[in-house]
């Protein structure tokens, strides 16, 4: 199956050529020009007389992205921003919350230190007060820090379900190994890592959490008093090998056989303050979990609603073509630019240059979709040819190959340069343009100005390739709205219809007059 496209009718339409010229001119006007260029403008554009070779590779339904309506309102955008902020906050909490084992076997959960909720070091040290005080004082401290623990608990709840079984196992091995040789000396406070990467070291008189309180959440039923004899004859090596652990904890094999690590959710390591107020916190935690569940449910419903909306927007005549486009034609672009020589003073010499860009080579895979009375065009990827290693091409992304130099009389000069964009080491996803030729027309020139012309040409070619890649390479596309033309045609048809009705009305009136005149004549 083949299609015949009247390329001549397409290229002779001045409206299409002017629209493309205006588009390129606006893009070039938005560029930040270097110091040796000024007054850049596109003066002419023609599609040329040579049509491209187009091969249809696939026919199917349009991409879902084409159905997304950017004019739905600001509500969706605000929701997206809130989701991004929420994910960013969770990522920061994930980086800030760490479980740090100390040498005595106790652990402390690092506080979430943000720029807006932490104060002096003295305030942070309040969590590590001496346990030589009465238990009531510790309880008061726990109530004082109740709000902060609640915030840490909420932020770390999201992180715990992301920990893997390997992390849990390694953390427990470190705890057991450190517990095998307990020290009665004053332990050092584990380092606190601030968001700025600063490490501070503080000392403690005594760890607040016993080793038993850490192991209990993991389902370990052994307690410290059951294995005092085994602790004397056991070392860290025997623990790693799976023998009886210190303090009667049991072997690693026994611990892993309890199926405590089958879930990806690591149990919560409770502090003393949390244990005291655990009953009070349970109801609040349940409420927070329900709120998070409702939030995820709401997001899921929004996604389903978006899919349903896209399904409603689809029509039976929507179609998309995946095409292979191979173009080696005589399309051309005319540009005017002023070349500046900034030595010995800024703008010392200004020389207008006319650049004639032609002979584009494009071999790519593109998609053309028709839906909602609009045509969407986007380039997906390049197609490698056997002749991609053009002669004169090197590892540079844009390699000039001078095919001609001065032309015309002695008072005028110019050069013709072929630029190739074939680079095996190119990291870009798509180039679109593989080859392009530039013909420059300048006035009286010197060799140093000719070298600057080469810089101008290279700059313009790189910018042209960047414009095409950013504007019409996937995930970007251009849209040709056909609904406006249909509305104009309908308006024209309505006007013609009204004029016909008015003409018929006049004809009826004229007919009546003629009849009356005819009757008068008979009388």
Curated annotation (Swiss-Prot):
Annotated localization: Mitochondrion outer membrane; Endoplasmic reticulum membrane
GO cellular component terms, A-Z: endoplasmic reticulum membrane; ERMES complex
GO molecular function term, any single one: lipid binding
Lipid bilayer topology: Peripheral membrane protein
Main location: mitochondrion
Start-end of Acidic residues biased regions: 118-140, 148-158, 483-501
Record keywords: Endoplasmic reticulum, Lipid transport, Lipid-binding, Membrane, Mitochondrion, Mitochondrion outer membrane, Transport
Family designation: Belongs to the MDM12 family.
Function comment: Component of the ERMES/MDM complex, which serves as a molecular tether to connect the endoplasmic reticulum (ER) and mitochondria. Components of this complex are involved in the control of mitochondrial shape and protein biogenesis, and function in nonvesicular lipid trafficking between the ER and mitochondria. MDM12 is required for the interaction of the ER-resident membrane protein MMM1 and the outer mitochondrial membrane-resident beta-barrel protein MDM10.
The protein's name: Mitochondrial distribution and morphology protein 12
Originating species: Lodderomyces elongisporus (strain ATCC 11503 / CBS 2605 / JCM 1781 / NBRC 1676 / NRRL YB-4239) (Yeast)
Gene name per UniProt: MDM12
